[in-house]
Curated annotation (Swiss-Prot):
TM annotation in the entry: none
Protein's name in the database: Hydroxymethylglutaryl-CoA synthase
InterPro entries assigned to the protein according to its UniProt record, in alphabetical order: HMG_CoA_synt_C_dom, HMG_CoA_synth_N, HMG_CoA_synthase_euk, Thiolase-like
Domain of life: Eukaryota
Enzyme class: transferase
Organism: Ganoderma lucidum
Keyword Transferase: yes
Alphabetic keyword roster: Lipid biosynthesis, Lipid metabolism, Steroid biosynthesis, Steroid metabolism, Sterol biosynthesis, Sterol metabolism, Transferase
Catalytic activity entry: acetoacetyl-CoA + acetyl-CoA + H2O = (3S)-3-hydroxy-3-methylglutaryl-CoA + CoA + H(+)
Annotated pathway: Metabolic intermediate biosynthesis; (R)-mevalonate biosynthesis; (R)-mevalonate from acetyl-CoA: step 2/3
Active site per the UniProt annotation: E100, C134, H269
EC number: 2.3.3.10
Functional description taken from the UniProt entry: Hydroxymethylglutaryl-CoA synthase; part of the first module of ergosterol biosynthesis pathway that includes the early steps of the pathway, conserved across all eukaryotes, and which results in the formation of mevalonate from acetyl-coenzyme A (acetyl-CoA). This module also plays a key role in the biosynthesis of triterpenes such as ganoderic acids (GA), a group of highly oxygenated lanostane-type triterpenoids which are well recognized as a main group of unique bioactive compounds in the medicinal mushroom Ganoderma lucidum.
Signals that turn on the gene: Expression is up-regulated by salicylic acid, abscisic acid and methyl jasmonate.
Gene (name only): HMGS
Amino acid sequence: MTVPINASTSQDVEAPPRPKDVGILAIEMYFPKRCISEEELEAFDSVSKGKYTIGLGQKFMACCDDREDINTFALTAMTSLIEKYNVDPKSIGRIDVGTETIIDKSKSTKTHLMDYFAEAGNTDVEGVDSKNACYGSTAALFNAVNWIESSSWDGRNAIVVGGDIAIYAEGSGRPTGGAGAVAMLIGPNAPLVLEPIHGTHMANTYDFYKPKLDSEYPEVDGQLSITTYISAIDASYAAYRAKHAKAKKAAGLGGPAFSLADVDYPVFHSPYGKMVQKAHARLVYNDFLANPDAPRYAQVPERAAWLAQPYKASLTDKTLEKTFMGVAKAQFDGTVEKGMRCARRCGNMYTASLYGGLASLLASVEPAEIRGKRISMFAFGSGLASSFFTIKVKGDTTEVQEKLDLIRRLESMDVVPCQAYVDSLALREKNHNAGSYVPEGSIDNIWPGGYYLESIDSKYRRKYIRAPKA
């Protein structure tokens, strides 16, 4: 016998009013207390002067030992965000984490963050981790924004955390390491509003990957990683421009196609500084191909040759690259460089790199100047996943700039000898995957109020402690 269900006996629950201007309400950066000089690393590695500082465009690189892991990074970044902005833990309904620093094949970093909310009586928090190289934080951000804009939204805000420890085996990749984390408060009526169009490109590549679960070090195809990044920015930018044109047509709007002329401040994922210069120059090249007769390209040399260049050849043509880096230099120095503070000081932060760029921009440009401006964001993760999207600064960023206090904090990092970095990596190698141990790194290297790993027991359960605040 079946019993009919009378729908009228259920109470219909209406969704809350649709939110407007969903985006980033607040942002916080975390980075280790120590860094090394890339100039000193050149001498330490006995390589030619300028190989890292000019060739890679790097200045410093953050480092940490076995007292820190992705969970301590995430805990410190998130807790600092909550405390600086007096966020009620019960006002958070979702947490999304992006990272590629995997220390457990099952248990997410997000679960470690839940202790903070459980103490406040809030365990109703959606979201888990997203993983794909450096792209996970952007997937996390899109997930959080989409949740707030969906019918599932319960009226609360979200938090997005992204962070990584970027380290490499001895060799050419090691100078492109770094470390850091970002935490962002996501909600409606935000000063930094995510605009609705995303241009995305995804593919299956083996430019950078981590198949060795007994090691933190990646497998890297250096040349392929460069062409993969460049082809990804081409494809995601093209997808964005196509969607933008379609949206304009549907709205009955005319005018020229979208280009960098519509962007006030471009921000890029930064594996290393020179790659950002190449990426920006590549967007300028794409705009040139789309509108070669624009007055701003009148002085481009060998115009006919670049217009006739086969696409595949363009990916590795050093003359083309150098030409458009020259064309783009003034714009790079005046706009893109303002988003490079974290990258210059901390190096590659993987999932936090793009948002470290955003934080750097907000720290570098006065709130009155940046208000009303558009920021483009290029997210990239090897393997590969990439997106081009935009943020409109609709509100006042004064509070964000003041509470970030980014410039002073970056300058207060301890610059340590290169041998200290090598020793830190040796310590991490020695204790990677270890159980029943107490980390050997000094807690003097932890910022006041930062979390650190106290111990791992015989069942590989990690215990974290927070350092006293200053």
